[in-house]
Amino acid sequence: MFGPITVPYEAVMLYNVCKLKEGVEWSEDLEFAIGEMCNVVRSTYDDFIAGQVLKYAGFVSEEGSVGDYGPEGNHFALITYWKSFKSHEESHRADLFLEAFGGVLDYCSEAKELGYEIMWQGEN
């Protein structure tokens, strides 16, 4: 569960930024809701490859940022890798997923999920 992941080059990556509601902080309850959702995805959908949950650490790189940016607010990111965008979308229409994701959305004011194709990857 906390080990390294391997991502095939052909995979698509979905990047979901989940902004927490005003006054909501990272908590065991939120972490449990995210874990429940991740477990549903991992154990149910064959075209799911891997995923990561990232808690915003509160800093913005001045060296790596260009242009205007403001406070990012309290949020977390869900990064998932799938065999296809179509498989991802089908999974997210299923009642089982919608119920689990609803548990996460109880803590969120908004969520936006963007899809990406891998153009380069490497490791050291």
What are these regions (language model features)?
Residues 1-98, 107-124:
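Short S/T/G/P-rich N-terminal loop/turn motif that feeds into the first structured element of a domain
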